[in-house]
Every structure is written in C-alpha cells, then in structure tokens.
Amino acid sequence: DSDLVIQSDSGALAGVEFTTSKGVFLHNLPMRGGSGTLFDDVPRDRWKRFVAQTNPGLVVLQFGGNALASMTQPSQVARYASAIGKNLDHFKALMPHVPVVFVGPSDMGLAPNEFPMLAATIDALKHTAFVHGAMYWDLQAVMGGPGSMAQWVDEGLAARDGVHFSPKGAKLIGQRLDMALRRAMRASQPTEPLGL
C-alpha cells in the first residue's frame, strides 16, 4: 500500500495521471452539464502542451443531450451544430492525424415529442461531424432508435427521468462503443494477400 499526499498553499490541482508503458489510456475531461462548445475557449498553448504530453491516438466526444433541453427552434439547432463544428475544427487543427469520433445524443424522453428538436439535432450533428472530418456514432440508433428510451427505463438501463443512463446502462453503452471501435480498427487494418 502506498499513500499519495499533495500539499500546497496555492494553486489548483487540475488532475493527476498514473500511467504505465503499455495498454490503452483514457484521459477524461469531464464537463458535467456541458454542451461541447467550449474547447476552443481553452488557450491553444495549453492544448498543445496537453497533446505533446499525452500523444492521443483517438478523440471521443459525446455531447448534445444537455443542449437539447433548451432547444425549441431549428435555428437553435443550426447554431449549436455550427458551434460543434468549430470545436471539431479546433481538434483537427491541434491533432490533424488523430481520428475524432463524435457520439451523438441518446434517445431521450418517455413521451412522444418531449424533446421536439432531438431528431433535427441528431441529423445536424451527424452532418456536422462528417463535414468537419469526424466520425459519428449514432447513440440513439444503438439504443434501438426513436422511442427506445422507454424500454431502457423499463429494463433498468436508464433512470426514470428518461434522460440519464443507469450505471448498468452506461456500462452497456460503453461496451457497445468499445465493440464498434474495435470493429472499425480491424476493418482499417491491411489484409494479408492470400498465398494461392
């Protein structure tokens, strides 16, 4: 057993990293309640240092759900998608050879049309991801499509609010994303010629 003690009279601790020389490393930038439009507000020199230190091989962004609660007009969807596009461009400029996967919003709500801009937002984000050089993973489709949230709630995979996943549901989504990423990696590997 080891203890880690950090003492300081000033400054703020932004994070701690524990790594080894092998395996997959995940750097999580939690933005609880965020809509994914603030990455380009961080000074570019800080991003450059972070990229140089971590050497990322993949960027995964998952946003859209928090923004949906306040969207009632197509013009709001267009503005949001435009802001996401600027942030995707930001990542592509910082890491031009690193693939970016944008995970779209989940299905949301238990009543029809509870989130009237959900379909339009998914379509806009999908288009934005492709136009800005990112891949799009359709979380709503993975769940079962429009209206699937009710079944996820019934099966204990989502909270009764019809918006948030339960720990069990979050684990299932994580496993499905992992499988999709692994399939994509295998598909991108060069195949060996058959020695006939």
Please annotate each region the language model reported:
Residues 106-196:
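Catalytic His-Asp segment of secreted/periplasmic serine-dependent ester chemistry enzymes
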Residues 1-82:
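Conserved SGNH/GDSL esterase-like catalytic core that processes O-acyl groups on lipids
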Residues 47, 80-91, 121-125:
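A general structural detector for well-ordered alpha-helical segments in enzyme core domains, enriched
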Residues 60-68, 89-122, 138:
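Active-site segments of SGNH/GDSL-like serine hydrolases
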Residues 7, 46-52, 71-72, 92-93, ...:
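Low-complexity, Gly/Pro
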Residues 24, 54-59, 95-100, 131-135:
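Loop/turn elements at helix/coil->beta-strand transitions in domains of secreted/extracellular proteins
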